[in-house]
């Protein structure tokens, strides 16, 4: 039977209406995806441990050393985001830059990452700015230590070049209380702590001005461990050339 003009028009209307509905559903889904910012459930997203994010820490924003070994940053509140929060252990270390300098070291520390053996030798590692030099005024004589960004007691990383910087004896000693606080909490509770240490270099200096240390206990929302500090890479009584790592008595 031959279709009448009216019937033909109604058929076209139905086709256009179905196409319009399909397009409308597509637009709604697309907009919802953009607004969510994630292709899936955000609660199930974990940090991408295969790539280190760029964390901006400018040396110029850090006050000059004034006699205290460290300062508190941002009200002692770390800069972790909601997407960083996870109870799944991981560790991630930045590639050395063109000057051989370390970058951010980031981990969610749990008991499963902690060492079960004594630390080995790291004397063969020569971080950027390294010099073997002694002063009678320095405890233990040696001015510089090979400082772990994330302490060995936390992630069992010993001779990892991406986790070792040239640090004064003074800085190394003043990082340890923060490491101990974190390690003791994890051993006592079995919980996890987000832990990030970022060396801060000025320009193309080979010696870091210091390190930014952040930690946050995950399961109890920071009740157990929560700090955000900058520890200075200085040695009282010794002048340091941060461009090269050379030093002299004041």
Feature names for model-found ranges:
Residues 37-89:
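N-terminal, intrinsically disordered, polar/charged segments of Gram-positive cell-envelope systems
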Residues 80, 84-250:
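Domain-level detector of nuclease and nuclease-like folds
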Residues 15-16, 41, 151:
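Intrinsic structural disorder/low-complexity segments
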């Amino acid at each position: 039977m031959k279709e009448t003009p009216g019937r033909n028009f109604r058929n076209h209307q139905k086709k256009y209406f179905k196409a319009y509905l399909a397009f409308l559903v597509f637009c709604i889904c697309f907009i919802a995806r953009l607004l969510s910012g994630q292709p899936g459930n955000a609660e199930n997203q974990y940090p991408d441990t295969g790539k280190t994010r760029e964390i901006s820490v400018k040396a110029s924003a850090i006050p000059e050393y004034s006699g205290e070994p460290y300062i508190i940053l941002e009200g002692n509140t770390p800069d972790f985001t909601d997407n960083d929060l996870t109870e799944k252990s991981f560790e991630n270390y930045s590639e050395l830059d063109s000057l051989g300098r370390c970058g951010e070291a980031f981990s969610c520390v749990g008991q499963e990452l902690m060492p079960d053996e004594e630390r080995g030798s790291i004397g063969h590692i020569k971080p950027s700015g390294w010099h073997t030099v002694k002063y009678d005024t320095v405890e233990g004589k040696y001015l510089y230590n090979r400082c772990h960004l994330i302490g060995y007691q936390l992630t069992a990383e010993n001779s990892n070049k991406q986790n070792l910087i040239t640090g004064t004896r003074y800085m190394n000693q003043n990082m340890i209380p923060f490491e101990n606080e974190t390690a003791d909490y994890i051993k006592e509770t079995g919980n996890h702590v987000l832990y990030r240490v970022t060396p801060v270099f000025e320009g193309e200096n080979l010696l870091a001005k210091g390190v930014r240390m952040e930690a946050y206990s995950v399961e109890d929302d920071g009740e157990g461990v929560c700090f955000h500090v900058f520890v200075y890479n200085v040695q009282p009584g010794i002048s340091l050339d941060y461009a090269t790592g050379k030093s002299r008595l004041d």
